[in-house]
A protein has these predicted regions:
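Hydrophobic "anchor" residues on beta-strands that sit immediately upstream
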Residues: 9, 45, 151
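Active-site-proximal helices and loops of the catalytic beta/alpha 8
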Residues: 14-103, 108, 130, 139-143, ...
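Short acidic, glycine/proline-rich loop/turn micro-motifs
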Residues: 114-116
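Active-site groove signature of glycoside hydrolases
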Residues: 1-21
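Aromatic-anchored helix/helix-loop segment that forms the rim or "lid"
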Residues: 88, 119-138
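Short, solvent-exposed loop/turn elements at domain surfaces
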Residues: 110-112
Length: 228
C-alpha cells in the first residue's frame, strides 16, 4: 500500500485494544507495527487512536517511539465556533508535539451545526457571520504546535448534524449516526462564494505553515499569553 498506492501512512483504530495482557504488550505490538511501516517508508505516518484508562502513561511512551496519538479537543473548537469564550474554549491540549488534534472528526458533531443551533448572539441566525468564523477556527488549531487534522468538508462549513440523514436532513436522530448525509455538492456548497472563501483562506493558512514559513513552526516555539 505504501509503495503501490503511495499512501501517507496508517491510523490504527482503538489501538488500546490490541491483544496483550499488559500495557507493555500493547505498546510493544504497536511499536512492532510502526517499525514495519517505517521499514518500508521512513516518512510514513503511524497514528494511534489510543484511549483507555492507561492512556496517560501509554501515549507519551508511544510518542517517544516515533508514533503519533489521536487527541480529541473538539469541545474547545465547538465553543469558539459558537462564539462562547468560557473555560471550555481551552486550546492548550492542541499545542503539543506528537498529539494529532482536530476541530472535527468522523465521531464528533460538526462545528457549524453547533453554531447554527446554539450560537451566541446573531451567530445562531446569521449564516454569513457563522461561516466567516470557519477559517479563523481552523487557524486556531493548525497554527499551534504539533500535528493536526482537517476533517472532510470542515473547510466549507458543512452544517448538517452527524445525526442527520439525507432523507430528513433537519431531523436530529441518533439512529442516523451512520446514515448517508446531505451532499455538499448537491447543496451547492462549492458554488457558494462565502464557503469557497473559507476554503481558500484555510488553504493559505496551511501553506503558511508548510511552505511559506515552515521554520516558524519547527523546534520549540515560545508560547506567551498577551493581555490588553
Amino acid at each position: 500500500w505504501l509503495k503501490e498506492y503511495k499512501i501517507d501512512g496508517y491510523r490504527m483504530d482503538l489501538s488500546h485494544g490490541l491483544c496483550g495482557t499488559t500495557n507493555n504488550a500493547m505498546t510493544h505490538i504497536a511499536d512492532y507495527y510502526n517499525n514495519g511501516v517505517k521499514a518500508v517508508s521512513e516518512d510514513a505516518y503511524f497514528i494511534l487512536e489510543h484511549w483507555g484508562s492507561n492512556m496517560g502513561s501509554d501515549r507519551p511512551k508511544l510518542i517517544s517511539q516515533g508514533m503519533m496519538c489521536w487527541d480529541n479537543v473538539t469541545e474547545a473548537y465547538q465553543e469558539t465556533a459558537m462564539g462562547w469564550l468560557g473555560s471550555k474554549a481551552d486550546f492548550s491540549r492542541a499545542n503539543r508535539d506528537g498529539y494529532v488534534t482536530y476541530c472535527e472528526s468522523h465521531d464528533e458533531e460538526r462545528m457549524q451545526y453547533k453554531a447554527k443551533m446554539y450560537g451566541n448572539a446573531d451567530l445562531k441566525t446569521n449564516e454569513e457571520a457563522r461561516l466567516n468564523r470557519v477559517a479563523v477556527n481552523v487557524a486556531f488549531n493548525v497554527l499551534l504546535n504539533g500535528p493536526h487534522m482537517l476533517w472532510q468538508f470542515e473547510e466549507i462549513g458543512y452544517d448538517f448534524s452527524i445525526n442527520s440523514s439525507d432523507e430528513k436532513p433537519d431531523e436530529y436522530n441518533t439512529d442516523n449516526r451512520c446514515s448517508k448525509k446531505p451532499s455538499p455538492y448537491t447543496l451547492g456548497y462549492f458554488e457558494s462564494e462565502i464557503r469557497m472563501k473559507q476554503y481558500t483562506q484555510i488553504a493559505q493558512i496551511i501553506q503558511l505553515r508548510t511552505k511559506l514559513l515552515p521554520e516558524v513552526f519547527e523546534g520549540n516555539p515560545t508560547v506567551a499569553n498577551i493581555n490588553g
